[in-house]
Amino acid sequence: MMNRFRKWLYKPKRSDPQLLAQFYYADEELNQVAAELDSLDGRKDPQRCTLLVNQFRSCQDNVLNIINQIMEECIAHERANRDFCVKFPEEIRHDNLAGQLWFGAECLAAGSIIMNREIESMAMRPLAKDLTRSLEEVRNLIRDQALRDLNIYTEKMKESLRHFDVLFAEFELSYVSAMVPVKSPKEYYVQQEVIVLFCETVERALKLGYLTQDMIDDYEPALMFTIPRLAIVCGLVVYAEGPLNLERKPEDMSELFRPFHTLLRKIRDLLQTLTEDELHTLERNLCISQDVEFPANADPEVPSAISPVLVTALPTEEPPMAKAENTEVELACSMQYDEQELEQLNMMVHRVGDEMSSLLSPPSVYQSPAHRANTSNEASPCRRALDNLTDEEDRVFFMEDLDGSGEVLARSRPSETTISWVNNSCYNAKQPALYQDSVLQNGDLADVVSVKDGQRDISNNNNIDGSKMLAASASLQNSCSCLEAPESQLYLNGWDTNGEDAETAEIIAHRTGGMKISATVIFNPKSLTNSPETSPNLASNRIPSSSDPLTSNEEDESHKLSIAATNCLINSCVCCGSCEDTREDSLEGLRNVPSSGKVINASYSLIKSKELGHLDRSDCTVSAKELLKMDSPTVLLAEKETTRQEQPYPNSSKCLPLNSGSQVEMDSESDEPLTASRDQLRSESNRQETGNKERPSEEVEEPPSDRASADNITSSSSSQDGLRDSALSSISSSDYESVSVTTCSLSSIDSLSSCSSDDIDQEEIQLALQAAKIASRQKIRSRFHSSNDLIHRLFVCISGVADQLQTNYASDLRSILKTLFEVMATKQETDDKGKQKKANQGLRSAALEDCALCQETITSSELAAKARDGEFEDPPDWVPDEVCSLCTACKAPFTVIRRKHHCRSCGKIFCSRCSSHSAPLPRYGQMKPVRVCTHCYMFHVTPFYSDRAGM
C-alpha cells in the first residue's frame, strides 16, 4: 500500500531527462513485454511470439544501456576492467551485445545449453545464475530510488552496481570466448607484426610510386585489395625475416597466412627468380584491381635472373624447343585456367628444408611427380621435350625445391639417356689429368650414391645404341672428345642441360682443387632411375648365372657392399689421395660382412683417371698409385666379367655379380711406409692401365706378387689420422645404402690442406653452391614460355591468396587496414599552434559566412542554459519548396527520385545525402532527434565543435 502511494506521489515524468527517470520507464516497458510474453502461447501464434521476443530483447538492451550510463556517472572510477574486449571480433562488438549477453545468461540459468558447447555451458551456468540474481537486485534498487529522489545515488545502490559490473564483465568474457575464437597474446603479437609489414609495404609503395598519399588519405576502396597483394610480395622477398618468414613453423605464422603456407612457399621460389624489372612489373600489375591481360605469345626467351658476376661462370641455358612449330606445345602454358592453376598449386606439397642439410643428405630414389617416366622408345630429344611440355600442360607448372633444398626427388629418364657426361668438351693438354675420362655410365655416380634394394641395377647398358656405345668406348680409352650424337642427353642437377653447363662443373671442380666428384654431386644430387622399358633387362641382369652361387637372399648384402666399396673409391679420389687410411678401414669392415658373394661397381675408368690426375700435382705428399693397386683385384675381376658378357664393346664398365670365390681380400696389417718415387708410381700406373686394357676374356687371377705389393701399399699410414673416424669408415652394413658422396666430399675439406698449392678456399665452395642455385633457378624459369607468362602466374597466385583474405579473415583484415590508415594518413602539423588556430578560424569563417546562425554571437553554453530554463526560441522559417530547385549544399537538381528535405535547424532545403543527420534541438524545444543538414549538424548542433571553434 505504501509502495502504491509513493508510486502515485513521486512517480517521475516520462519527459524527465534524468537517468533514474529514464530507467523507471524503460524497466516498466520491459516488465510489460515480459508479462505479455509469459501469457502467450507461442504454438498458437508464432508470429506474435517472435515479435514479442524481439521487443523483449530490445527492451533489455535499453535497460542495460541506462544502467551502464548510471554506472558511468556514479562509479566511473570503479568500473571493472574490460580490456579483453579488444580481443573480440569486430562483427560482435556492437551496441546490443549487452542485451544478447543478458538473454544468454537467463537461458543458461534456466537450464538451457549452447549448441555444441555443452562443457562451456555447464561451466558458465553458476556464473549466469549469479549474474541474473545480481541484475534483478540492481533493477529493484534503481526503481526504488527513482520513486524517492532522482538526484541521489545511495551507497547500497553503488555497491550493488559494482558487484553487478564485475559479474557482467566476467560473464561477457566467458560467453564470447565460448562462442567465437578469441586471440591469445601471442596471436596478437603476430598480428602486430603483420600490421608493421603492411605499413612498411605502403611506405615502400609510396617511395616507388605504386600508391599516392591522396589514395591513403581518401581511403581509396581499391587499397583493400592492393595493399594485401603488395604485402605478400614484400613479406616473401623484401622483408623475408618478417611475419611471412616461411622458415618458421606453420603454427608460428599469422592465422591469416597459415592456410596458404605451401602455396606461399611456391610463390616465394618463383619470386626469387625474378629480376628487378620483372619484380617492378609484377608489383605494378598487382596495384590494378581488375585482371591484367598478358600477351600470350611474347618473346620466348625468359630473361635471366642471374647476377652479372656469375653469368660467365654459368652460361644461360637455351630452351631446347625454342623453335618448335607445334601450336599445342605453344599453348601448353595457356592462361585460360587460372582458377585451376591455383587449385593445383594448393595440392602441390613438397617439403623444403635447409640448403646444406640437403647437400649433406643422401638423395632419394623416389620419382618426382614432375618427371614421370616416358613410355616412348623414340631417342630424339625433340620428342622427349615435347612429352615433357605435354606433362607441364597437364599440371600447369611444378616448382622444384629451390637451391637444392628439401627432399631430393629422383628423376625418371628414358632408356636412351643412360649415358651422361661431365667432362670438358674441349680438352686442354695443360690441364691436370683430373679432366680426363670422366664418363658416368647409366648415372654411374648418382646411382652409386643412393640405391634402394630391388628398385634398379646400377649396371644396365643393354639399351645403349651403337653411336653412344662407341663414344663410351672412346672415352674409356682416354679420349677427350665429348659425345656429339644428337641423341645424347646431359644431366646437370638432374635436369636436361647442354654441354656448357657440364663444362661449368669441370671448371668448378678445377677451381676447388680436385673436388670434381664433389662438384658433380652438387650439380647432380638426384639419382637417375631407369625407364620402364629397361626394367626387363634390369631384371635379367640381376639374375645370377648358373656358375654363380649367389642366392636371392644375398643380393641385399651384395648391393650394400657395392655401394660402400664404390663410395670408398670415390672418397679416396675426392680427398686428393689423403684418405687412404679411411678407405682401408672401410674395406676392412666390408670383409666382415657375412655374404658369400659381392657386387663391386666397376667405375674403374672414372676413378683411375681421377687418381692419375693427382700424380701431376706438384705438392701432394701422398700418391694415388697405392689406391689403384689396392683396388686392382676387384676392378680387374669386374672388367673380366664385363668383357665376357659384352663382346662387341669390350671397354664398357659394368657392375656385375662375381663368383663366390672372388672375395675382396685387403690385408692392411703391414706398417711399412711407401718408399717408391712419384715417377716410379706413374710408370707402374701406366703399366697397370695397359694391362687392364689388354687382358683377355678368359678367367684371370691375381699374381701373388701383385697382392703382396697391394698389401704393402695399402698398409702405409696417412698424415691425416683424423679421417679414420669418418662417416664412411664407421658405418654399419645396414647403413651402406644411405652413404652420400657429398658427405665425404664436404667432410674431407680439411684433408685438402695437405696440398699447400691447392688449398680449397671457402669462397670457391660458396661459388659452387651458388652456381648450383643459379642452375636450379634457371630450371624453374625454363618451365615458362616467357617472362610475361611467369609474371602472370605470380599475379594469379598472389591475387588469389590476397582476395581469399577478404573472405576468410574479413574482420582481422579490416582491423589491420584500419590501423594502417590511422598510421599512414597525413597528420596535421601541431608544431605551431597559433598558425593552426588561425587556419581553423579562417576555415570556419569561410565555411559559415552565408549562414544566419553563424552570424549569431550567442554561444552553445548560453543556449543550453536557456533550454534548461524553458526559454525556447521559435524555429526558423522554412524556405518554400517552389523557390528552390537545387540542393543548397551540393547544388544537385531535385528529381522524382531526389526529394527535397527541410533542415529543422536552419530551414533550408537539402537533398537526402546532405541532410542525413538527426539531432535534438533543445533551443527550439525539440527534445527528440529531428532531421538536420550536415552544416548545422557540424557547426550548430554539436556543442563541442561550436565551443572549440569559438575559442
UniProtKB/Swiss-Prot annotation:
Cross-link named Glycyl lysine isopeptide (Lys-Gly) (interchain with G-Cter in ubiquitin), sites: 87
Zn finger intervals (FYVE-type): 881-941
Compartmental location: Cytoplasm, Cytosol; Early endosome membrane
Claim: Nuclease is one of the keywords in the record: no
SUPFAM superfamilies given in the database record: FYVE/PHD zinc finger (SSF57903)
Binding site for Zn(2+) 1: 887, 890, 911, 914
Coiled coil: none
Disordered: annotated span: 360-382, 527-557, 641-726
Ranges of biased composition (kind: Polar residues): 360-379, 527-552, 645-665
Positions bound to Zn(2+) 2: 903, 906, 933, 936
One of the record's GO molecular function terms: zinc ion binding
Annotated disulfide bonds: none
Biased composition, class Basic and acidic residues, residue ranges: 679-709
PTM section of the record: Monoubiquitination at Lys-87 prevents binding to phosphatidylinositol 3-phosphate (PI3P) and localization to early endosome membranes.
Alphabetized PROSITE patterns for the sequence: ZF_FYVE
BP terms from Gene Ontology: negative regulation of epidermal growth factor receptor signaling pathway; negative regulation of epidermal growth factor-activated receptor activity
Entry keywords, A to Z: Cytoplasm, Endosome, Isopeptide bond, Membrane, Metal-binding, Ubl conjugation, Zinc, Zinc-finger
Predominant place of localization: cytoplasm
Record-level GO cellular component terms: cytosol; early endosome membrane
Notes concerning its domains: The FYVE-type zinc finger mediates the interaction with phosphatidylinositol 3-phosphate (PI3P) and localization to early endosome membranes when not monoubiquitinated at Lys-87.
Family: Belongs to the lst-2 family.
Protein function: Negative regulator of epidermal growth factor receptor (EGFR) signaling. Acts by promoting EGFR degradation in endosomes when not monoubiquitinated.
Protein name, per record: Lateral signaling target protein 2 homolog
